Amino acid sequence: EKKLYFGIYERIPFAYNGRIPNDSRTTETIYRKNMEKEIIREIDVQNVMTKSSLPVGGFSVNPYVGCPHACKYCYASFMKRFTGHTEPWGTFLDVKHWKPIDNPHKYDGQRIVIGSVTDGYHPYEEDFCRTRKLLEELKGTNAEIMICTKSDLVLRDLDLLKGFQKVTVSWSVNTLDEQFRCDMDRAVSIERRLKAMKQIYNAGIRTVCFISPIFPGITDVKAIVNRVKDYADLIWLENLNLRGQFKRDIMGYIREKHPELDRKSVV
């Protein structure tokens, strides 16, 4: 089920925020199997750690800008306002390169959330290994690691995760219907997510099933809970918040695929 890509269309230098990265940094334009264009850039950043404003606190780390999962309901699409990207959400990815973290032990006791506005384990992580590099730099610290993902690639880094005293891995699962999942995102199948959750749980690492977003009339919360209850330490719930650009997209999908749920279609 690994994503298939073919054909590098161009390879050119890229300037980011007015700075020209070193010569090894390039842009690749890749065409997916359906010929949808996806632009991959490698960029240099000064610091990958950001003080988090999320309720969970601590620090937020996003090894990438953008996310190829292209979830139709993704709140992180607002990031385009700050990065200057004009491409549609899900069709660009900036791969961050940063200087080695200075004194990693300063994060002892701090919660570090990996993947608040991207997925650190999307398919390209298999090649770029930026999330793994981050974990390697934090190895030996007492930082509390929290990973948010829709992937099973996190299993690759189980060797590193076992070395931290406090680790939580959360998977977003808002359906058991694979067709609906395919309509909403390009991440791995629900079965692969749940299988990874079980393996991480059996390895002694705390797991979370994040039922988000809940689509009224579509998401069967009870069925998901019954499916994961034996290997999810925590279950989090989040409502569907329709706002911005994706409100139009989601409502268009509902009218087409589930007209019975659209109040406008009810006479």
What do these predicted ranges mean?
Residues 258-262:
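Long, charged alpha-helical interface segments
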Residues 173-177, 239-242:
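Short, acidic/turn-prone active-site loops that include or flank metal/cofactor-
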Residues 5-8, 12, 16-19, 31:
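Short, positively charged and aromatic/hydrophobic N-terminal segments
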Residues 25, 31-170, 176-180, 190-195, ...:
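Conserved Radical SAM active-site core
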Residues 192-249:
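Conserved C-terminal portion of the radical SAM core fold
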Residues 266:
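Conserved small/polar residues in nucleotide/adenosyl-binding loops
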